[in-house]
Regions:
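Conserved AdoMet/S-adenosylmethionine-binding subsite of the radical SAM
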Residues: 111-125, 129, 135-294
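Auxiliary Fe-S-binding modules of radical SAM enzymes
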Residues: 1-20, 24, 247-395
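Short regulatory "switch" loops immediately downstream of catalytic or recognition motifs
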Residues: 3-13, 92-100, 186-188
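Flexible, acidic/Gly-rich N-terminal and inter-domain linker regions that tether
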Residues: 1-68
Length: 395
């Protein structure tokens, strides 16, 4: 109901079908209640799209614990959410299997999985930052979540804890329950006594979703003692793909709910998401367009989550082939699966633009590629050769 009530909220009936038309055009509807006609018929999915596009499962060091960055881990406590988004980057884990898709499932018992996560963190002192997610932590009974957080706070090397919950926007009533507010207060007090930063990260994509109840829930969390409530939105066509949309959302978050605009992620390369995705060039232009309107601490960074690399500001690409829609990225650290990979820090990693955004010759090139893996390898070779030629010319 929280989401439904924000769809086409101020449309006056103007004859038969007018409300239906407004409902279909609504930006919140476009990503929360997708219909088949939303999808593109030319490129419904990118040839490089995968169900675990960030390879988080490959980097599990314990079941559900992804060690992707040098000092930070992602703890996926459970595979369910109060609401399911079509653009979910963890679509391969979150939600139930269907007759068509057999999803990844946790094997271990919840208590055993959480215990294994804590054991890994105790014996891995370089980890200081834990994103506690899922799914959505709001779907975990509060006593179990508090018990996990309490044990997490007993680990000396942990200095930052972030609770990831879209439910702060989609089901704010959860975070207003007395037992939850009181429990957050206890966890926040322990974190403060230990000098640990405790924050909540939510996921709001449009200004219409910042309702009075969302604002009440966010303020309740701040009053309970969390250091900050931050927003990590996703950049999506037809939802928030203009500077006006983004600024309206940021002002609503700041002014109405005391939520800090933090990141906007480019939509990940998962199947059937092309109608939402923007090109890197479009993201760069949007980042430029929103600068100067907000305080520096509340100016969100638009980031590209590059497979095997991690999130990078959209202007950090190493090179960019705009005809074929391929941006090339490097990194300065190894993931948990690359300890023996001598080329990890010199390798080129690729992010792909939606093919329909490319010029005609770029789209034609992709139509000729029968082998997606070969196209990927060819792109890497082409970029490498171009840089080597430039180096020789400068040399």
């Amino acid at each position: 109901p929280q989401m439904m009530n924000t769809m086409a909220p101020r449309v006056d009936p103007a004859g038969p079908g007018s409300l239906t038309e407004a409902f279909y055009a609504d930006p919140v509807r476009r990503y929360m209640i997708p219909v088949f006609s939303d999808r593109r018929t030319d490129w419904a999915s990118h040839p490089q799209a995968t169900r675990d596009s960030l390879h988080e499962h490959d980097m599990w060091v314990a079941e559900g614990l992804t060690h992707r960055y040098p000092t930070k881990v992602l703890a996926e406590l459970l595979p369910t959410c109060p609401q399911y988004c079509g653009h979910c980057t963890r679509m391969d884990l979150v939600g139930n299997s269907t007759p068509v898709i057999d999803k990844l499932k946790f094997v271990g018992k919840p208590a055993d999985r959480l215990g294994d996560m804590l054991d890994y963190l105790r014996r891995t002192p370089q980890v200081r930052d834990v994103v506690v997610s899922g799914g959505d932590v709001a779907n975990m009974p509060w006593p179990r979540l508090e018990a996990f957080l309490d044990q997490l706070l007993d680990i000396e090397n942990i200095r930052d804890i972030r609770l990831a919950t879209k439910a702060l926007m989609g089901l704010p009533q959860h975070w207003l329950q007395d037992d939850v507010v009181e429990g957050v207060g206890r966890v926040a007090a322990k974190a403060r006594a230990r000098g640990v930063s405790l924050a909540i990260h939510t996921h709001v994509n449009h200004a219409e979703s910042v309702t009075p109840l969302v604002a009440e829930a966010a303020k309740a969390m701040l009053e309970a003692g969390v250091r900050d409530v931050r927003n990590q939105g996703v950049l999506m066509r037809g939802v928030n793909d203009t500077s006006v949309d983004l600024l309206d959302l940021c002002f609503a978050l700041q002014d109405n709910a005391m939520i800090t605009p933090y990141y906007f992620y480019m939509c990940d390369m998962i199947p059937f998401s092309e109608h939402w995705r923007l090109s890197l060039q479009e993201a760069q232009e949007l980042q430029h367009a929103i600068l100067g309107y907000l305080p520096g601490f509340a100016t969100p960074r638009i980031v590209c989550d590059v497979p095997f690399v991690g999130k990078r500001w959209v202007h950090q690409e190493d090179s960019y082939d705009r005809v074929r829609g391929m941006s090339f990225w490097r990194k300065n650290y190894r993931t948990s699966i690359e300890a023996e990979d001598v080329d990890a820090l010199s390798r080129e990693y690729v992010y792909y633009d939606p093919i329909y955004t490319l010029p005609a010759d770029g789209q034609a090139w992709w139509r000729e590629q029968g082998d997606a893996l070969a196209a990927h390898d060819a792109a890497i070779a082409r970029a490498t050769a171009s840089r080597e030629a430039s180096a020789l010319a400068l040399g």
